[in-house]
Amino acid sequence: MTNDDITSLKVRVEGFVQGVGFRDFLVMSAQINKLDGWVRNCADGAVEALVSGPTKAVEAFVAAATQGPRGARVTAVDLQNSEPPTEKGFQRKATA
């Protein structure tokens, strides 16, 4: 695998996405796809994540974020290219 095969994205998910297990859902998706990064709630009600790994795995994570867990209602997903995280693994962070 070359660096060209690695994608790093900042993902912001809006809608009814807090209080429904959204962060745990994304942690599970990241672990299944062997991705690095983090996820956290935002004070404005959104959920944001930094995710990095093989492009196809990142695409699968974004697809999961677009759907969300049962009980969530996603109204918008914003993607921005990003630098990869400094730590390996995927963490659930405190609200920002």
Annotate each language-model stretch with its function:
Residues 1-96:
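Intrinsically disordered, low-complexity, mixed-charge
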